[in-house]
Regions:
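Membrane-helix boundary/juxtamembrane motif in polytopic membrane proteins
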Residues: 153-177
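Membrane-water interface of transmembrane alpha-helices
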Residues: 67-77, 139-154
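Select subsegments of transmembrane alpha-helices in polytopic membrane proteins
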Residues: 92-97, 171-179
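Alpha-helical transmembrane segments and their helix-start/interface "positive-inside/aromatic belt" motifs
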Residues: 8-18
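Conserved small/polar residues in nucleotide/adenosyl-binding loops
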Residues: 215-222
Length: 222
């Protein structure tokens, strides 16, 4: 009886997250049904609509977040993660679910109002898009160093998976790099917004991602 109570208590948060994301999905579908038949589904660097399509193209942003909650429930039931990894996993998956849902509503509320090619979204989208992405890198960067070696969460290369020392050093360095990436992305978004530029945010993001991939890619000796 005590074990059953402990299990139900442990999965209560993922269940609440699942219920919230499912409710969000239902509301998103309702608003999609109420949207115009043709809306902006792609923007150029100046946030001018360059492609129109069905508002149902926004649907993935509403149906994907529940899978994060399902993943948490699955991990809690099977106890696949080390105790030190469970809190980072919960925080990272929760933030990803919230970020994807937020992007869905951003597209639906602001971008969904744009119905003509060349029309610009009337919103500070550099701040609304790039600042949350910067926050994601900061949060994940703070938790990278505390993640212990495992096969599902973290930076997985042959060398990191083979050694606790290499794993710890890689995640310690990349944690700092991701925090710098996040801060830089937020500052770049502010620069693009107030300096009226159109490339700093995405240029910084692309360069940061490429740099991370190059750093974590296996070397020939791995």
């Amino acid at each position: 009886m005590k074990k059953k109570f402990f299990l139900s208590k442990k999965i209560s948060y993922p269940v609440v997250l699942l219920a919230a994301t499912l409710l969000n999905a239902v509301l998103g579908i309702v608003f999609i049904c109420l949207s115009p038949d043709r809306v902006a589904v792609h923007f150029n660097a100046a946030f001018e609509a360059d492609k129109l399509g069905s508002p149902w193209m926004y649907l993935p942003a509403f149906v994907l977040p529940p899978f994060a909650a399902v993943g948490l429930i699955f991990e809690n039931v099977r106890k696949g993660q080390k105790p030190q990894n469970r809190k980072p996993l919960k925080i990272i998956l929760t933030f990803i679910a919230v970020l994807i849902g937020y992007m869905g509503w951003l597209m639906l509320v602001w971008c969904g109002k744009v119905s003509e090619i060349g029309q610009k979204a009337e919103a500070p989208l550099y701040i609304l898009v790039c600042v949350p992405m910067g926050m994601m890198f900061i949060i994940m960067g703070n938790y990278l160093p505390v993640i212990k070696r495992n096969g599902t969460l973290g930076i997985k290369t042959p060398s990191t998976l083979a050694s606790d020392y290499v794993w710890a050093q890689t995640h310690r360095v990349m944690g700092k790099v991701w925090v710098v990436m996040g801060i830089g992305e937020i500052l770049a978004a502010l620069a693009d917004t107030f300096a009226k530029t159109e490339f700093i945010s995405f240029g910084w993001l692309a360069a940061s991602i490429v740099g991370c991939l190059l750093y974590t890619s296996p070397s020939p000796r791995d």
